[in-house]
Amino acid sequence: MWQKPSLTKSMMNEVSSNSPKSPTLTSSPSTQSFANRVLPGRNLDGGGGGSNRLIFGGSGGGSGGGSLPSSPVSSPVNPFNLNGGGGGKSSRRRGVTVAAGSEQVETRRKILLGNSRPFRRRARSMEILNSWDFIPYQKKPSDDEQGQVDQYIQGENDEDLTSYESYITNNNTTTTTNTNNSNNNNSNNDGSGSGSGAGGSFIGTTTSAKTTSTTSTSAATTTTTTTTSSSSSSPSSSSPSSTSPTIASNNDNNNKIEPPQPSKIANSVPPLTLSQSQTQQQQQQKVKPPPPSPRFSTNSSGSQSPPVPPRSSKSLGLSNDFSISLSSSMSSNSLLISGSINTLPTSSSSSSSVGGSGASAASASISSSSSLSSSSLSVSKLIYENNEENKFVVVSGPKDQLVEYLCNKNKLDFSFVNSFILSFRYFIEPEELFNHLMVKYETKVQTTSSIKVSKQFEEIQDRIRQNILIIISVWVDCNYSDFEDNLSLHKRLFKLVQDTPHAVFLRDSIDRQKVSKIPILDLYEKLKDELLLSLSPRGSLSGSGGISNNNNGSDLKNSNNGNNSSNNNNSSSNSSSSSSSSDIKNIKNSFFSLTTMMDWLMNHLSIGYATADSILKKLFKLKVIGSLGSGGGFTNISSSHTNSNSKSSKEELYFFTSTKSIINKEIYSRSFMDYSPQDIAKQLTLIEFKLFQSVKMKELYHKSWTISKSKFENSPNIMSLITMSNKIANWVATEVVTTPHPKKRVEVLKRFISVAEHCKKINNFNTLMEVISGLSNSAVSRLKETWKSLPTRYVNSFNSLQNFLKTDENWKSYRQTLKTKETPCLPYLGLFLQDINFIEDGNSNLSSENDWVNFKKMNLLTSVFTEIQYFQRHPYFSFSTHQNIQTYFEKDIVILPEKELYAFSKFIESPSNPLFRLSKSKNQSIFNI
């Protein structure tokens, strides 16, 4: 309530007379300042200046004067009575409770819930803040915005500023700012202000004028940034303006930056100044923390250098990624990509890069294709899932981050590398991928001011280059057709091999692709003939390192001419064409050193040592080459290598197990009944496996074999194998229904069932499916009399083979057998094509939400592609070619259309067929007897 001045004065006198021991109320300047804000224009001493708002005792509690109707209730809290009582002699004694009336309760509730604010004296050490004072917050720029602030952190520590100031002091750098030191005499300017700079802000507070640096934190790199403030801003439009703390350059004090001290605020706020004591300067000089990595570095003239670019990718954030803070002296045309240095393309780049002219054009095509190397990504967007083996696998992500993850500096994820190489054509072209790999490979490490940092950069780049060579090696092993079909890529690949002498494994991968399609036994025959023909008929020692055993081994000598044998290989090959076969017959046997055979293979096939070694190991496994070991016979080639490498006194000698040329004594026949079932199964295996091995991965992409207009162009090998399979199945049915005599027809059935049994034994499931399909043809299965005449053993065998190839439960029996992966094996290609069809139809290449690559589909496709390639790498080395049988299948087999097959089937078991009537009458006569 509001009282008149005279009434207030009389009340104060009465209180002071009744309470002589109570202290006299005096208003301090700070209290008066508070009173001016809460009770404007009123004094606390009650004298002059108008009436004050008071809460005092009424009728229920003591002798206080009469109250106005607006506030008739006594209050124990009187802002003018420091004793806290109602005042007067008749005040209630302590501990006595007096019931209050209903009116008093209601009015007291209004007072307690109203705007009345009782005065409580503050401690003298605590400064009184304005009602609009607030705790300042410092703005923190995120990596995405590179300086634009969207987060806030509370400015509590000034250690970063101190360390950065000492770094600038030690490097003799000065920071100049445009200081706005407008002195504001208004007492309401004691709030905090924030000044915005180019890359950060300084925020000053009234309690502690602290200046904190802007800290930019990434997934693995923390960069401390400090900038200056050039203008002041108020926290809100209604708040009074305040002066921001500034850092002034002082050339007289050795360009040292002095941090601001907290200013004491009483009734008015003086301008904020920067001062630092001598002891603080000495302590600052003693402590020299490691220099941070400023985003902006300033010099004495105030000009700013370009900011260091951030990392272009954080796609390796989940794979123990680390990075090194870049120093301010690093050139601005380099990027730290997942811990590696990636040089941006400049106009002065030389054309002597790996890959020749094609590689020089690669840097120009990167920016136009997808700009993979220069894409700036702040957060990893790769999505992972747990697979069946409880391992994390990539299931989705942007194309550029998938490529970055492929060639990172860490240990390679070979499952991801294999999946990527086998399926990258779904979202990227081969040239684009090779260009990106070459850009990463050719990146040169920029020199920095720190030797330690430069060494770390070199180690990172060496790991990246090593990983890229491994990736290209996997690419050659899995998809060499990408280089064979593209002449420019093929040239760049061989240029890379020539310019990288330490890339031995990449060279071996190319050599394996050269030799993979050469029949091993044909190669053996050529090796044997040329080495034997290089010897004279009398068995003397030749330049090729061979030794004759015509004198029962008495002339066996150590051959030390292995190094010179390569010079005579051309002459020996020329002499082999003019020599007669009688020369080979005259030679009983000869012994050759390991070096001699290795040199012949390396020079004749233009391959490396490792590939030649693998060929000899296969020949030893086939037991077509023997060794004079300790116990005679065959020895392991690895032990021979150790002996040859250690340069032992006597090098191991090898011999060919068969020196006579294979002469086929069988006469060519146009009837398959003249050939054994085992030979037919083997020759069909060789014919079809050659087609299966020729299937390229690109023929399986995008279901190209199902497009009627282009299937023979895009998938020629798949269509050749499909055509061959249909041809064999129709040939089986044709041979059965075109055999008129019932007994011969039963023999034909028995022969085909035997061929199917041999196909299963040698793991030729593709030919097995063809034979069973031909026997299950409706034109054959309807021959009831023929099947009745078939012996029980063959009937049971046929039923067993049919159950093995049943499609029930998704080919359960066949898939379980295929999982054992016994090699060599020719799988049924139709099931692989069916699986690819289901995966393609049920999954999209890109996710519908954000157009990211659906890498889960790529993993599913890779599981099929990997299985196909596994069986392609294990051919039937032990099978020799039977030219008569292969000629029969190429030229002399007869195939009838479906209509004619059914017509023959109806005729051979109809009464109109005299042979059928004759055989039936004989059977009836035998039955009657």
UniProtKB/Swiss-Prot annotation:
Q: Name one GO molecular function term.
A: guanyl-nucleotide exchange factor activity
Bias category Polar residues: which stretches? 1-15, 247-256, 295-305
Question: Bias category Low complexity: which stretches?
Answer: 16-33, 68-80, 169-191, 203-246, 270-287
Q: Which UniProt keywords apply?
A: Guanine-nucleotide releasing factor
Gene Ontology annotations for the cellular component aspect, listed alphabetically: cytosol; plasma membrane
A GO BP entry: positive regulation of calcium-mediated signaling
What CDD domains does the record point to?
RasGEF, REM
Name this polypeptide is given? Ras guanine nucleotide exchange factor M
Name the species this protein comes from.
Answer: Dictyostelium discoideum (Social amoeba)
